[in-house]
């Protein structure tokens, strides 16, 4: 029987059928061929081209199914992004729009057997926000387009620049502290040299004393010669009896002494030196204590400045474990359940992936709580002076609702914070 004419009703009906969606059971995904009836599908399965495609499938079935699954996922998300980008819509509506294209990848050739299984996969992978309602599954596309990626990149760049500025200021303050400590050590060493009993002052004092005694001897000799020239022998005898002193600069005290008065003067001078050394030592100690107190005050002021600059009214950050406390989500079983912050939106809203169900929720930070790990666990400091640093939990004070942590890595590596509030630290997800 020949073909129908171009404008006959039968030819028109055939063209309409060719454009529309035929029965799913008569479609061959490997050959991407739609048959109109059972007889045509049977003939296609017996064809040589179909047999070759089935041999290819038999060599690597998992790879073929995975390829069809990726194509199905990409096409479905493309349709959802273009048609329902910012709306909450039923999954069946989107699926019906998707299969309206006769060249779409059929679901029975993918690794998902049902639409419900595919929707759960979208929620687990974070492609969509998934809600199970009495009317069925509803999905909302999570927009991760280039515009938001650019905004996130600019935000990360701004945060890095702020952190770099803070690190520069902290290095400058650390250098100032080192210089202050070095100057304190130098002043202490100079004061110790001045107060030592074997110093230059003792040597100069003995030399002056020797010169005075020598001048006195010369004056006495000249007077004796002018008064009585005949008594020269007596003067010579006196000079021999009282010889001039031999000065050794290493000796502490002069060896020449003239009676008890000079001994008293020497002892008084020694006492004055000791008192002066003690006074200088006390002054040095007081000066060192004053410098230390000034240094402590400087460090406290710097700590307060960091606290003021890093204390914010938002604390969410990716990678931490939080507890959902929203009463509106209690009916769905999410209340008091833990999840991981995957992304932060506008500083105050977080995308939370629940640990048990793997569902992705958007929750405000007011309806979230921080999670404290066991002793020895890693935490992130989410607010306060050391915001953004990782630390290890050392102990917990349940009466004061605070914890003791030790900062790890970074500029403050090894610093111990003795009392940090529960709200300022949160468990890190491993």
From Swiss-Prot:
Residues 319-370 are annotated as: C-terminal subdomain A. Residues 51-160 are annotated as: Winged helix-turn-helix (wHTH). Keywords: Coiled coil, Metal-binding, Nucleus, Zinc, Zinc-finger. It comes from the Eukaryota. SMART domains: Kin17_mid. Residues 261-278 have a biased composition (Basic and acidic residues). InterPro entries: C2H2-Znf_KIN17 (IPR056767), DNA/RNA-bd_Kin17_WH-like_dom (IPR019447), KIN17-like (IPR037321), KIN17_WH-like_sf (IPR038254), KN17_SH3 (IPR041330), KOW_KIN17 (IPR041995), Rib_uL2_dom2 (IPR014722), Znf_C2H2_sf (IPR036236). Residues 179-230, 261-284 are annotated as: Disordered. It is found in: Nucleus. Residues 376-427 are annotated as: C-terminal subdomain B. GO terms for molecular function: double-stranded DNA binding; zinc ion binding. Residues 147-183, 283-312 form a coiled coil. GO terms for cellular component: nucleus. A zinc finger (C2H2-type) spans 28-50. Residues 209-224 have a biased composition (Acidic residues). PROSITE patterns: ZINC_FINGER_C2H2_1. The keyword Nucleus applies. One of its GO terms (biological process) is DNA damage response. A motif (Nuclear localization signal (NLS)) lies at residues 155-158. Belongs to the KIN17 family. This is KIN17-like protein. It comes from Oryza sativa subsp. indica (Rice). The lineage of its organism: Eukaryota, Viridiplantae, Streptophyta, Embryophyta, Tracheophyta.
